[in-house]
Amino acid sequence: MFCNQCEQTTRGDVCHQWGACGKSPEVDALQDLLVHCLRGLSQVALQAKSLGLATRETDEFTCEMLFSTLTNVNFSTSDFISFVNRAIALRESLKLQIQATGNAVIQSAINSFQPASDTQKQIQQGKDLEFEFISQSAKNVDIFSLKLTLLYGLKGVAAYAFHALELNQHDESLYIFFHEVLANLDAQDKSLQDWLDLTLKVGQMNLKAMELLDAGNTETFGHPTPTTVPLGHTVGKAILVSGHDLLALKAVLEQTSGTGIKVYTHGELLPAHGYPKLKQTHPHLYGHYGTAWQNQTHEFERFPGAIVMTTNCLMPPHETYKDKVFTLGPVGYPGLQHISIHDISLVIQKALELPGFTEDSEQKTVTTGFARNAVLGVADTVINAVKQGDIRHFFLVGGCDGAKPGRNYYSDLVEKIPNDCVVLTLGCGKFRFFDQNLGDIGGIPRLLDLGQCNDAYSAIQIAVALANTFEVNVNQLPLSMILSWYEQKAIAVLLTLLYLGIQNIRIGPTLPAFLTPNVVKLLSETFHLQLITTPEQDLAVCLG
């Protein structure tokens, strides 16, 4: 087993025996086998596109399958065997369509590959392909490092593109890019600079994917508005929806209407409360329960209702509560019931069987919904506060949360940020400090929750708008970005910021294990990318 795509990789190096996320060596091998089959499918898809053939099914499948290989999404060997078979079926179907046009299929070893019919042999094929991919770059570990960065970033882009296509937002250039990267991942004629340029293009494409998702979310659910969200609970039957999928949450809300069941969000679905067409249309969307993904084992155990897991981040469930957890979309785990977004009757049945909350709890609240439209709507107030010296500096403190030590840096940092500074946050990293009362500056809250990790798009739009107003570039704004990372979507977001030329980003709690010292040096020299140190030291530099 070789997996170093997340921040929690064993000993900060690579997972060899078992994934720190709970992924088995068998699933790891089948994920590598799936990616190999997708590479062959992409080669054929590109030829099909060049002939004007329709490839939308393949495009969408490629996005969803890359998404399924993200950290904490799918742990099911049977699912990945099914995915591999589907990839081959789509590939062969496209080949027949190409031949029907009178053209010969451009054959290669990758697009002629056939998976074994036996599960154990497929697992061995995956292990062999993993070793072959590593061996191809053995002579240049820096190129291998950038290849991994490219692939992991692409997985993050695929996650956002998948959510966007669910909302009927598509972009052909995005699909072509997926196929081009996968089809040429084994290229041996590219320099280190070539691979760096391609990696930064992942950032460019991720900006497009986040833009599509932003359009899909706002057109479907309205622009987020500042909304107070209760963190407590109320008496009654309950369903908890975790993950990131707003469309799945909408389906749960629609199908539970009139049942008396209250729906609660968990993890990165907290920002859902800010979308008018979710909150205002569905009054039984009651509040938010729990915190970030890594706390789910004890939070899910205590929740007295049914739980729906959408997209990532699923942890291996404990036996004590796995019978009330349901998976949806690309999420999978052996022994958990998988449901369709169109029929959640099993979830409703389970929620009605379980006791639900038997008493009301204390109603502490937080506020979410400060996306780009809300913030830019009060831009004049913000600008005047900066000009008058009431706001000295902005800090974007966000990203992924995680379980490894060192992440208390972010809560300590926010506590120490001076009172004349505003904190923007997004992603599940905010759960380190989301319930702190930081007060306001002239009516502007000092803590602004922009939304989910993909709402980095909002942060970018806000920064660009402020830069245009002050007639400077983004790097000249009184703005510091201090980010936490865990998985592949965070990699994609970081690559977007680097593609945009944003300098002096601080990341933590550790550097990605897949970055070699030379690649770290290259990124540091080019973009002044740096690792966090201590809250005191970093604040002194940012405000100096």
From Swiss-Prot:
Protein keywords: 4Fe-4S, Cytoplasm, Iron, Iron-sulfur, Metal-binding, Oxidoreductase
Keyword hit for Transferase: no
GO annotation, cellular component aspect: cytoplasm
Gene3D superfamilies noted in UniProt: 1.20.1270.20, 3.40.50.2030
One Gene Ontology term of the molecular function aspect: peroxidase activity
Sites of Cysteine persulfide modification: C400
Catalytic activity: A + NH4(+) + H2O = hydroxylamine + AH2 + H(+)
Top enzyme class: oxidoreductase
Chain positions recorded as hybrid [4Fe-2O-2S] cluster binding sites: H244, E268, C313, C400, C428, C453, E487, K489
Cofactor binding note of this UniProt entry: Binds 1 [4Fe-4S] cluster.
First-listed, main subcellular location of the protein, grouped into a coarse class: cytoplasm
Swiss-Prot/TrEMBL GO biological process terms: response to hydrogen peroxide
Cofactor(s) demanded: [4Fe-4S] cluster; hybrid [4Fe-2O-2S] cluster
One matching Pfam family: Prismane
Residues annotated for [4Fe-4S] cluster binding in this entry: C3, C6, C15, C21
Entry EC no(s): 1.7.99.1
Places the protein is found: Cytoplasm
Role according to the record: Catalyzes the reduction of hydroxylamine to form NH(3) and H(2)O.
Entry-linked HAMAP family: Hydroxylam_reduct
Family: Belongs to the HCP family.
Name of the molecule in the record: Hydroxylamine reductase
